[in-house]
């Protein structure tokens, strides 16, 4: 809430800009046969976590849901498994994407990272192949909780690990996802 004008700015963005715009957009989408709109939570956006997604959804329409990308929540220091539980019924899509908090760097500078993703050596967190940030036990629990909350949709692999070749990253991620997703 510092500086003092920030709460007013955020309230203005929600109440005078975002909610009215989304109400109109949802009506337009419905008129054109759209059934779901999935927003990906991402740092520095108005809708960046489960609480802000649910705020928008509750104010506008339940056709708005989350494209749950666990890597973004990990990079913000949140727990994607707890987030999945909170978002029960509001998860419309899931990304298979991992992130790693870089020990020794995040401990000093925190998680608000603005360096280019290409600076993997000095960033406090990095996108990594699935299983290279969170272990397979974590991924199995994540997918199990998704099932418990009713999610039975697709998982899109996003491989943005710049510490290995694309081929190695894809193979590592595919293997980890195959071992983690119960069929």
Place the predicted regions along the sequence by residue.
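Active-site acidic/histidine proton-transfer and metal-coordination neighborhood
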Residues: 1-65
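Active-site beta-loop-alpha junctions enriched in small/polar residues
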Residues: 2-4, 40-44, 69-73, 97-101, ...
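Gly/Pro-rich active-site loop or hairpin
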Residues: 15, 50-54, 73-151, 167-168
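A generic secondary-structure signal
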Residues: 28, 55-56, 145, 176-179
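Hydrophobic faces of well-ordered beta-strands that scaffold small-molecule active sites
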Residues: 37-39, 64-68, 92-96, 153-157
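Conserved, well-structured beta-alpha core segment at the onset of a catalytic domain
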Residues: 46, 55, 75, 163, ...
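C-terminal helical cap(s) of enzyme catalytic domains, especially alpha/beta-barrels
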Residues: 166-183
